[in-house]
């Protein structure tokens, strides 16, 4: 446990000492809220509004709809990119020093994943400084549900990041592959647009995307979907169905947990063998 804590602590200290990284964690989400939220709010309402749902569209606030997606984006990108430190440590020789020590390789992998998980949750929580400016009401009940959900999602995504980092040898290669993965996963998760009326092949990609369930879980918690008008809930894409079954927050948490167990196992095995 001591070695896991030491690796976790190292990543946390590096995060807080990197001022540029802290600034960047605010800048990109802020730009997304301004450009997508404010600039496209009217267009999205017009596209989603139909003759049968005028009242629902009148109360559709795209900025509020998008905010949980921004949280998902921040947690996703931070979790995945946290594994970049593994590749950099390998390139600079630091990882070799750890590997020749009596520390178990599984402990190294778990320590790195927990470090990435914690940083991702911290950055996700920092986004709540924008809440007063977008008119969202966040209460204690929401946060009690949201924080464990964020830890669960960040753990799963950090495990995916470590799996990728264990398979790639250079920082440039890692960043290239991650960039290729990030945008399809984000845009097919419903983070920025309701995922309704998609073609069958795209629905399949949405269904197998772990980020879909993560973002939907965040939206249902933050927007308190169970209290929304049914028409508005439908318009916002919060009635996610898989194989004809409407998914609940519990279903989504269970799916993300199973993915997390699978990916941390694969990542630990791959990390142990590749180094």
Task: Locate each region found by the language model.
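A short amphipathic helical element positioned immediately N-terminal to and/or at the very start
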Residues: 1-16
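Alpha-helical transmembrane segments and their short interhelical loops
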Residues: 105, 109-179, 183-185, 244, ...
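Residue-level recognition of transmembrane alpha-helices
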Residues: 7, 25-26, 66, 70, ...
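Hydrophobic alpha-helical transmembrane segments of multi-pass membrane transport proteins
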Residues: 31-36, 58-134, 186
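Alpha-helical transmembrane segments of multi-pass membrane transporters/translocases
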Residues: 220-275
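Residues that define the loop-to-transmembrane-helix transition and helix capping
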Residues: 19-20, 64, 106, 172, ...
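Hydrophobic alpha-helical transmembrane segments of multi-pass membrane transport/permease proteins
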Residues: 17-46, 63-78, 122-124, 179-187, ...
């Amino acid at each position: 446990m001591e070695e896991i804590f030491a690796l976790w602590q190292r990543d946390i200290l590096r995060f807080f000492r990197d001022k540029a990284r802290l600034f960047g964690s605010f800048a990109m989400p802020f730009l997304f809220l301004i450009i997508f939220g404010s600039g496209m709010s009217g267009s999205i309402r017009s596209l989603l509004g139909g003759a049968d749902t005028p009242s629902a569209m009148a109360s559709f606030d795209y900025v509020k709809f998008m905010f949980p997606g921004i949280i998902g984006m921040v947690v996703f990108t931070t979790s995945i990119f946290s594994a970049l430190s593994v590749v950099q440590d390998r390139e600079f020789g630091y990882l070799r020093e750890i590997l020749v020590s009596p520390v178990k390789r599984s402990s190294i992998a778990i320590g790195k994943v927990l470090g990435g998980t914690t940083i991702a949750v911290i950055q996700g929580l920092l986004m709540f400084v924008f809440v007063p400016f977008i008119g969202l009401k966040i209460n204690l009940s929401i946060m009690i549900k949201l924080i464990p959900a964020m830890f669960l999602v960040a753990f799963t995504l950090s495990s995916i990041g470590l799996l990728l980092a264990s398979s790639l040898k250079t920082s440039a290669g890692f960043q290239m592959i991650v960039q290729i993965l990030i945008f399809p996963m984000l845009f097919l998760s419903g983070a920025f647009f309701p995922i309704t009326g998609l073609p069958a092949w795209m629905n399949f990609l949405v269904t197998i995307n772990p980020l879909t369930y993560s973002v939907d879980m965040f939206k249902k918690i933050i927007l308190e979907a169970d209290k929304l008008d049914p028409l508005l809930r439908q318009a916002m894409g919060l009635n996610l169905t898989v194989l004809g079954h409407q998914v609940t927050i519990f279903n989504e948490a269970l799916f993300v947990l199973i993915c997390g167990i699978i990916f941390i196992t694969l990542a630990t095995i791959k990390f142990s063998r590749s180094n």
